[in-house]
Amino acid sequence: MKLLVIGNGGREHALAWKLAQSPKVETVFVAPGNAGTAIEPKLQNIDLTAHQDLIEFCRKENIVFTVVGPEAPLAAGVVDDFRAAGLKIFGPTQYAAQLESSKDFAKAFMAKYNIPTAQYQTFENADAAHDYVNQKGAPIVIKADGLAAGKGVIVAMTLDEAHAAIDDMLLDNKMGNAGARVVIEDFLQGEEASFIVMVDGNNVLPMATSQDHKRLLDGDKGLNTGGMGAYSPAPVVTPVVYERAMNEIILPTVAGMKAEGHEFTGFLYAGLMIDQSGAPYTIEFNCRFGDPETQPIMSRLNSDLSDLVEAAIDGKLDSVTAEWSPQTAVGVVLAAQNYPETPKKGDVISGLDAANQVGKVFHAGTTANEKGDVLTNGGRVLCVVGLGDNVVQAKAKAYGALEKISFDGMQYRKDIADKAINR
């Protein structure tokens, strides 16, 4: 069968790569894809992004189903458009995707359905926001309401930082429409984890646990990014935390969306903060697989992903199980110079073949020129995954592969997975 994956990042490379491993799959088309998906066996890039063009392509090629990678097409209603055209697609509707595309929508939804999260208020008026912050004190968290590519969250450790973030979003329009409203919420202490599940509207199939590293620099310092690395499984998610996350967060969310008359289908990602007592709180929802979490998680999936997605689209997730490798996977992101602010593009990347002999290199912000050179073409350029019998071995494999790669201004964290190693 022929499948389609929408997107051009590392997450989409990993999803398409895993789908293509199925003996039932002939070709996975990636729209628009990157330099990695262009050369991966059984994958083929297509230069289409408009919904109607993609729908016509699916009809012409008899695509069995489509998987949506990034948040922007979901927020733009790609699932609604495909369903209206009678095509099978895995992802949430535009309404359901508001769990990610509007922080205010998500917080109000969590309050309504008693899903544990930080206390919050939403503001469009800067003066009112400044007053609220003065009343609450720091540390405090300022979030752009809309989609900001993972960079719309400011964890303000001082009042000055909080006031500056409010001005940036509400007065200086630094985030555009995404920051025209801000959600201000209490700062939660604890350890973060990514809890990702597949949902068919009613049933839930959990994916392997993982932990992302949002900050640019070692020791969780520097600016927030889309994610600088991840590992799976995440030992912070103990069996007890796992049960609590399912029963207190995931299942009430799925039931709540159904009660709202908008069944949730697709990948649902709860960004968790686990406090000292082991209680999970929801920091955010994403309505798609995480990036870079997808890369290590897919590296551990032994099941046929196409079977899981088909079951989810058909509302039969309760009839399948996901089998996972007992190994640990560590993925480290290589980012471009000046990421996350003004990443430099067009630098030649060398050492990819050598790195793939050691680990697995997933491409994100890459493109190829006429000569066949692979060039940087975005902020997060590559994600290098290593597998090992334990987290120490997996980390060594990932960094061993990464050392083969070079491009001008390449930056990466050296402490990915250290939280698991030091537990």
Regions found by a protein language model. Give the residues of each.
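A conserved helix-loop-beta module that forms one wall/lid of the active-site cleft
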Residues: 90-152
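Solvent-exposed alpha-helices and their adjacent loops that cap or buttress functional pockets
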Residues: 21, 38-39, 90, 112-114, ...
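Internal nucleotide-binding/catalytic subdomain
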Residues: 152, 156-294
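Active-site "cap" helix and flanking loop/linker of ATP-utilizing ligase/carboxylase catalytic domains
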Residues: 246-268, 286-358, 369
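Short acidic-hydrophobic, aromatic-tinged amphipathic segments that line or gate anion-handling sites
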Residues: 44-50, 121-125, 156
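Generic C-terminus detector
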Residues: 366-371, 375-423
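ATP-binding N-terminal substructure of ATP-dependent carboxylate-amine bond-forming enzymes
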Residues: 1-94
